[in-house]
């Protein structure tokens, strides 16, 4: 990886001299590199997903009729706003927040579909640079937008940044000890929590959405600094005892007679080998698709319709709280891998579908009387989604050979994007149907 700092002091090659070894220096160097990479991947996960999360948290503001031109003087309505659609029992925008979801996810889907075919031919450093530039551009474009269409173009830039970054950094984990996957996953969960919480907090404090978005321009700069200045060279990594212990318990996902090789050879895999690896990955891809379909159908199809009038929170504030609590659950579970390892992720998919059915029934029948019960369900929803993500990639890292791991990571990261895209496509007509109910 050309962009990572990785100079190392060589040991003396002098012969004939017996010197007293200093075994603690290499150990300290190894520990220092371990923590630099751990922090580096955590920050990369945080920065990569930050713009994506902020755009979803701002979805109601992007589409709201209560915004003024330029997003410069947004004022939250009172606790009982006049419905946008007076003939509906819901307080609906003319366009579902799923429209923002689709703009925030479809470019990512295209990138992830094409990534296994040839993205590995492009060096990592240019990919990271493009990702950072797109993230910064998304904040600026949405902040200064005077129309929903222009704002959605900014959301598309955030999607390109997040999608390109995710497939790049997950592939990059193949060159480092498997422990960095846990740090990356925790960072992406942190992006959800900090992104939603920062947008909620700054707008609650009185900043306009424009000022809030412009205040976040330091995040893309932090992403570039984490990659180019913090990560050590992967060639210097030594997996160590933890890796050996994990490999002894590994159950191969792909049966092969070929000996394992060092990661980095995915570009030499034949189409037949890629297809064989892909078929083995379906056991993990399908449940992750289902989990993300269910949770984002809730987030972008139902959040806007779960509106309680018997509370001091306005509709926009309720939507931001939903997003923040969901992301808090995601962060907690994505950071829990060392405490709880789940092999059978199908169970998480089933539980998430039950969440969807329950909240959809509440939207239809309106039997929940307190917003705080919905808060608990949404927090639980986030816990399930985060656990599915981190355990899926951890299981794949354990059960694929080194020569297949880079390709497997790049391929599996399409799972969440595919599920989110399907949920957005179905949430749009559902929104229109429910908002026409009197």
Swiss-Prot record:
Give me the glycosylation sites of this protein.
Answer: 71, 85, 310
Give TM regions.
38-58, 128-148, 152-172, 183-203, 278-298, 347-367
Task: Please tell me whether the keyword Cytoplasm is annotated for this protein.
Answer: no
* InterPro entries from the UniProt entry: Battenin_disease_Cln3 (IPR003492), Battenin_disease_Cln3_subgr (IPR018460), MFS_trans_sf (IPR036259)
Propeptide at 436-438
Q: Which UniProt keywords apply?
A: Endosome, Glycoprotein, Lipoprotein, Lysosome, Membrane, Methylation, Phosphoprotein, Prenylation, Transmembrane, Transmembrane helix, Transport
Question: Cross-referenced Gene3D superfamilies, in alphabetical order?
Answer: MFS general substrate transporter like domains
* Origin: domain of life: Eukaryota
Mind telling me how this protein is modified after translation? Highly glycosylated.
Q: Which Pfam families match?
A: CLN3 (PF02487)
Look up keyword Transmembrane and say if it applies: yes
Write out the GO biological process terms. Answer: amyloid precursor protein catabolic process; autophagosome-lysosome fusion; glycerophospholipid biosynthetic process; glycolipid transport; Golgi to lysosome transport; intracellular water homeostasis; L-arginine transmembrane transport; learning or memory
Q: How does it sit in the membrane?
A: Multi-pass membrane protein
In this UniProt entry, the residues modified to Cysteine methyl ester are: 435
Gene Ontology cellular component list: autolysosome; caveola; cytoplasm; cytosol; early endosome; early endosome membrane; endoplasmic reticulum; endoplasmic reticulum membrane
Gene Ontology molecular function: glycolipid binding; sulfatide binding
Main localization, broad class: membrane
Record motif Lysosomal targeting motif. Required for AP1G1, AP2A2 and AP3D1 interaction, residues: 253-254
Quaternary structure, from the entry: Interacts with DCTN1, KIF3A, RAB7A and RILP. Interacts with CLN5.
**Which family does the similarity line name?**
Belongs to the battenin family.
What is the protein name for this chain?
Battenin
Q: Which gene encodes it?
A: CLN3
